[in-house]
Amino acid sequence: MLPGIKIFISLLNSKNGMYIIRSRVFANSIVLRKEQSDPFIFEQIFCEQQYTFGHPAKQDVKWIIDAGANIGLAAVYFSAEYPNARIISIEPDKENFALLQKNTSNYKNVTCINAALWYKEEKLDISNKEEKSAGYMMEPKLSNDVDLIKGITVEQLMKQFSITEISMLKIDIEGSEKELFENNAASWLSKCDCVVTELHDWLKPGTSRVFFKAMAEFDWITYVKGENIICLKNKAAHS
């Protein structure tokens, strides 16, 4: 039985609306909300191992941008899988972000940013607040409301952290990938070794078409695992 499944089964008797996972597998306790999508996401990452795909240069993975970090489960997984990497975890929702900080508190290689990955710098808001927090969608908002969400670009992150090459860009941003990939994506895709994304055509029709059009500008080895499309830059073809 996989370690993730053993841990997941041990959760099932937890109470009080929270699952608290304590295991030597993790650097600190992991908190999941019982009524949100957290247990399902935990199962995807640690039981189904949907982010396990055998990066060809694992020891050389230096920078991971985790867009749509939710409560930090992917960041925790990436920290174990790529111990030499710095991970930038971006999450727009305040409640998710608080748990992201808590769940990664002992992971010194993880930096948490309360923002949304977007194609340009502007203020955003959640357009579907009736949904569970893992399914929030972003929309531009022309307002000075202090509760609005900061939209941040890939280029801004690269400049802020002096990143010259992104080892992995993980994107799970509930439809915002459509705007991201249809607006000059080549400028930063040229600096990505690996893109891992979940597409949401049922939220924004045409998302897949936009994504594959942008990706076609470069040579990728592409395959699917679970809900994710994994694209590895085909460096061997150009060496």
Model-predicted segments: where are they?
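Phosphate/nucleotide-binding beta-alpha loop and adjacent structural elements of enzyme active sites
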Residues: M1-S239
